Amino acid sequence: YNIQKESTLHLVLRLRGGMQIFVKTLTGKTITLEVESSDTIDNVKAKIQDKEGIPPDQQRLIFAGKQLEDGRTLADYNIQKESTLHLVLRLRGGMQIFVKTLTGKTITLEVESSDTIDNVKAKIQDKEGIPPDQQRLIFAGKQLEDGRTLADYNIQKESTLHLVLRLRGGK
């Protein structure tokens, strides 16, 4: 290795259960992180902040199409070595809205005012598995049209939309 006197060596401890995972950003950049299966999503966001300077509250991590929750661990999501997570930035101006189903269940969504109704239906599909073409969204008594934005309908943070299912074959 041609190590000469007074050289400095660096000792890197590889923790038991330590592994590398990759985080891909929307710009296509890939970040490599050293993690353990027992790390929480919070921990992972903190490591991304250390490397990239992005505050954790602006980070959304996606794996296998699911948004990862802060308190859960990598092991909970079966994220193994060399898995790739996707990092989506939650822009300032992001907000939560609620979607209430006819069964009385309430779904919380992270959205932006500029999101279209299409986008919102796609988020509902991610969370609930309901295809967008079966979803009808109602706010303040009005049915919401796909191409319009939340801002168009003056839907603000913590607004509640109502989800009605359009059954196949129904008009």
From Swiss-Prot:
It comes from the Eukaryota. Belongs to the ubiquitin family. This is Polyubiquitin. GO terms for cellular component: cytoplasm; nucleus. The keyword Cell wall biogenesis/degradation does not apply. GO terms for molecular function: mRNA binding. Residues 1-18, 19-94, 95-170 form the Ubiquitin-like domain. Gene3D superfamilies: Phosphatidylinositol 3-kinase Catalytic Subunit, Chain A, domain 1. It comes from Hordeum vulgare. There is a cross-link at residue 94 (Glycyl lysine isopeptide (Gly-Lys) (interchain with K-? in acceptor proteins)). Keywords: Cytoplasm, Isopeptide bond, Nucleus, Repeat, Ubl conjugation. PROSITE patterns: UBIQUITIN_1, UBIQUITIN_2. Ubiquitin is generally synthesized as a polyubiquitin precursor with tandem head to tail repeats. Often, there is one to three additional amino acids after the last repeat, removed in the mature protein. Alternatively, ubiquitin extension protein is synthesized as a single copy of ubiquitin fused to a ribosomal protein (either L40 or S27A) or to an ubiquitin-related protein (either RUB1 or RUB2). Following translation, extension protein is cleaved from ubiquitin. For the sake of clarity sequence features are annotated only for the first chain, and are not repeated for each of the following chains. InterPro entries: Ubiquitin-like_dom, Ubiquitin-like_domsf, Ubiquitin_CS, Ubiquitin_dom, Ubiquitin_ubiquitin-like. Residues 171 form a propeptide. There is a cross-link at residue 66 (Glycyl lysine isopeptide (Lys-Gly) (interchain with G-Cter in ubiquitin)). It is found in: Cytoplasm; Nucleus. Ubiquitin exists either covalently attached to another protein, or free (unanchored). When covalently bound, it is conjugated to target proteins via an isopeptide bond either as a monomer (monoubiquitin), a polymer linked via different Lys residues of the ubiquitin (polyubiquitin chains) or a linear polymer linked via the initiator Met of the ubiquitin (linear polyubiquitin chains).
